Curated annotation (Swiss-Prot):
Native source organism of the sequence: Hahella chejuensis (strain KCTC 2396)
NCBIfam families for the chain: PRK12497.1-3, YraN family protein
InterPro entries per UniProt: Restrct_endonuc-II-like (IPR011335), tRNA_endonuc-like_dom_sf (IPR011856), UPF0102_YraN-like (IPR003509)
Gene3D superfamilies: 3.40.1350.10
SUPFAM superfamilies registered for this protein in UniProt: Restriction endonuclease-like (SSF52980)
Pfam families: UPF0102
A molecular function GO annotation: nucleic acid binding
Sequence similarity: Belongs to the UPF0102 family.
Protein name according to UniProt: UPF0102 protein HCH_05895
Organism classification: Bacteria, Pseudomonadati, Pseudomonadota, Gammaproteobacteria, Oceanospirillales
């Protein structure tokens, strides 16, 4: 039944985001917001790290059958994240704050943990 698969997928996604948040905190990041949504897109985690505001995309795959988790972040997805980040910065009055876009990828079914990809893409 497709609806049950969708619910399971959402639950797995939330679990991956929770684990990624713990991973980010363990790396010294301070989480300031989770699941920021706006008309243009969504940002999974927003964190402070040193002087930077870091917009973090969390990707999870249960298998690499259709490509890796990192490969699933298309140019179009990057553009939506960048748009959402710009909206966030404007709403919070932080347009002069240095920022970057990181990615955390993982597989909840394996013991490989998470991989951090700093500066995974750029808005320039």
């Amino acid at each position: 039944m497709p609806f049950k698969r969708l619910i399971k997928s959402i639950d797995i996604g939330r679990a991956a985001e929770s684990q990624a948040e713990k991973f980010a905190r363990a790396q010294g990041f301070t989480i300031v917001e989770r699941n920021f949504r706006c008309k243009g897109g969504e940002i999974d985690l927003i964190a402070r790290h040193g002087e930077h505001l870091v917009f973090i995309e969390v990707r999870h795959r249960s298998s690499d059958k259709f490509g890796s988790a990192a490969e699933s972040i298309t140019q179009k997805k990057q553009q939506r994240i960048i748009l959402a980040a710009n909206i966030y910065l404007q709403k919070k009055g932080l347009t002069n704050m240095p920022c970057r876009f990181d990615v955390i990828v993982g597989n909840l079914k394996s013991n490989t943990g998470f991989q951090w990809i700093p500066d995974a893409f750029s808005c320039w």
